[in-house]
Each structure stands twice: as C-alpha cells, then as structure tokens.
Amino acid sequence: MNRDLTKGSVTKSMLLFAIPMILGDLLQQCYNIADTLIVGQFLGRNALAAVGSSFTLMTFLTSIILGLCMGSGALFSIRFGQRDENGLCEDICASFYSIAAATVLLNVIAYLCLDALRVFLHVPDEVCGDMRAYLFVIFMGIPGIFLYNFFASFLRSVGNSVVPLVFLTVSAVLNIVLDLWFIIGLKRGVVGAAEATVIAQYLSGIGIAVYALLRCPQVRSIRRLRSLRWSRISEILSFSTLTCVQQSVMNLGILTVQGLVNSFGTVVMAAFAAAVKIDAFAYMPVQDFGNAFSTFIAQNYGARKTGRIRSGLKSAVCVSMAFCLVISALVFVFARPLMTIFVEAGEAEIIQAGVQYLRIEGAFYCGIGCLFLLYGLYRALEKPGMSVVLTVISLGTRVALAYLLSAIPAVGVVGIWWSVPIGWFLADMTGLLYFKIRKNKLLPLEKASIR
C-alpha cells in the first residue's frame, strides 16, 4: 500500500495519496459532529454549548500531539525519499518515546488545570457542570489520540494513506453507534457522548499501532537498535517542537477567541459550536490536501528532485483553489439548512448567528486553502519556523481584531467573524513574499528537471 511519490504523474500522485487522507479526516469530523448533532437535538442548548466549548479546548490539546507527530512525519518522509532505512528506524524510535512522554505530561496537566480552564474560557454558570463532566471523561482519550496520530503520520510518510482511513472508518461508525446508545438508550447525557468518543479513539489508536508493528519492517526493526545518537534525538525534537508550536499557537488563538465568544452568552456559544463544526468540515479537504502535498514535497526533497517539486507546486495551487471556490459557494448558499442539522428549527437566534458566521468565513476559503499549502511547503523544506511565523501572523491578527472590533457596540460579535479571513490573507501575503524572495535557495534548479 506504500506509494512512492517521487515517481509517476505529479498531479495524479498527489490526488491519489490525498483522497484517503481527506476521507479519513472527514470521518474524524464525524466524531465531533456525532456528539454535536445528538447532543444538540436530544440534550438541549446548554449541553450543546458545553460540548462545543470542550471541542475547542480538545482541539487545542490534540494540536500539540498532532504537531509533534506531523513534524516527525515530515522527517520520516525525507528519510524515505533519501532511501535511508537506518535513519528512518532511528527517527521512529526517538520520536515515539519523546512524543509518548510529552503525551503523558500533557494528560496530567490537563487534569490539574481542569477548573482553571473553565474560568479561562469564561464558561457561563449554567454550562459549567456539563462541561466539567464532559472534559473529565474526554481527557482519558488523549493517549489514544497519540497512538493513532503517531502511527498514521508514519504510514502516510511512507506513502500509505489507506490504512489510517480503514481504522478511522471503523472507529467513526462505532462512535456514532455508541453515541446513540449512551445518550438516547442509557440516558447518560454529555458523559455518554464523551465515553463514546474515548472508546472509538482507543480502538483506532491501538488498532493502527498493532498493524504497524506487524506489517511495517521499519517499526519492527526498532527492537534491534542498541542506542540512539543524541544528534538524531535533537533533530527530531527541534523539528517536531517547531511544528507543535505552529499547531498549538494556531489553536491557542482559536481557544482565546472561544473565551471571547462565550462572553456573548449561550446563544452565541451554541451558534459558534455548531458553525465551527460545519466550517471545519467544509475546509477539511484542503487542509488534508495541504498535508498530502507536504508529504509529496518532503519525499522529493529527500530525493533532491526539485524540478518535480516545482511542478507539484503549480498543480497543488490549481487543485486547492478550484476546490475552495466550489466549497465557498456551497457554504454560502446552504448556510441555513446546514445550521438546522445541528440546531432545532425553532432556535431562530442561534441559527441566525451561525448563518452569519458561515457566510463570512465561507466566502474566503481560498485564503485558508493557500495558507495550508504554505504550512505544508515550509514544513517539508525543513523550514518549520516559517510555518510558526505565518501562524503567529494569522492568529495574532485574528485575536487582536476580534477583541478590538467586538468591543465596538455597532460591530459586536460580527467583528469576531471578520477577524478570521483578514488574518488568513495577511499570513498568505507574508508566506508568498518570503517564497518569492527565497525561491532559488529553497528550490535550486536542476540541470535536468525530473518528472
């Protein structure tokens, strides 16, 4: 199932590799959508607001693990492109133990800071009880999140995007079934929704880990390693930490904005909770295409095929922008029907606030599509620090403008919505300008471009 992205048609290679990743992350969204849909319809607005705020917090915590795994995955892809099997084995071993230790530490901190986090997010009193109960259970799934993301990153780095999809499919179906049983059948409320998600996360995490141990020689050969060079560990930690910072800063900004949203009351909280799910679902394919593009670039960077990388850049921009235009049109037109999937038709205020959010964000998906390509490009070219810079610009703008604009009575919550696309485009301009200036150093021309 491994796909060598250094050979064959550029566009076809990227698309065939990206499709399972896109399907897999759409199913990942089903974890969250199942909770939101069932909670919103059967447990009411307070429970929906609690789960929605918890989702934003969990996205931030998950982004720390995901960033570490993505950083390691980029190095795995480069080693694979270089055909450096021993180096790949060392990287896998160093990454696994480092990220596992970070995961344990993160889990402990999450529980110790549980009540402080609720205060930081300005959670209304009527939502506090449900949110605390939900988070207490959902934090138990963090090790499962690590297992899945680590081994999925490894498999994708060597061109296998199908197996992660298989395990996510099984766990997503289980999550939905357990949601219905625990919430409707067993009447376990928001705790039941959390339990369903945790069980599904462990199924996918343990399952993909067992698969990698049984089927991947690079993983099995870890047992033969007698020692690890500190230089290798240092490289892994440096690269992964920068990617982790990029991912966590991005979601810390979103978490900060969540606290501002919560200050506008339960109606806006519930609208934001539902609209963010739709928003994430809509642009998830371009995010995954950006990650697939990153693996393509990293493998070819390791193989020193810069001519192929340049061709891939042109193809990726065309594919991503075309998709963004289609999705923007669909979200803008169908914003109201999409909101009614998560919110009862009688909740007019919630629906209207959500529609307003979706139509503003949805009109500018080309901005986030370009930004995902830039993140993937700089990560693959061993410039993760540039991804951090772009994230700080995007999220710094978003947070600053959100607080400034929302404080103006005539603007209010709409200022929060508009701050998002403005941040995207400022980061895009910075990333494109940097690439234009440094292009020939980042991608020196080959004597004969290899296709």
Model-derived regions: residue spans:
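Small-residue-rich hydrophobic transmembrane alpha-helices
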Residues: L48-V108, I145-P164, A271-A335, I368-L390
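Short runs within selected transmembrane alpha-helices of multi-pass transporters and secretion channels
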Residues: C69, V137-R156, P164-A172, A193-I208, ...
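Small-residue hotspots at the loop-to-helix junctions and early N-terminal turns
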Residues: R45-T56, L135, A194, T266-F281, ...
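Short alpha-helical transmembrane segments in multi-pass integral membrane proteins
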Residues: M1-A18, F76-P143, G185-T241, I297-F364, ...
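Hydrophobic transmembrane alpha-helices of multi-pass small-molecule transporters
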Residues: F60-S63, N175-D179, G205-A209, F281-M284, ...
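Helix-terminus/linker motif at the lipid-water interface of multi-pass membrane proteins
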Residues: C30-A49, R118-D125, W181-R188, S248-K277, ...
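N-terminal transmembrane alpha-helices
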Residues: L5-L43, T56-G71, L75, A100-N107, ...
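Transmembrane helical elements of multi-pass membrane transporters/channels
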Residues: L16-D35, V137, Y148, S171, ...
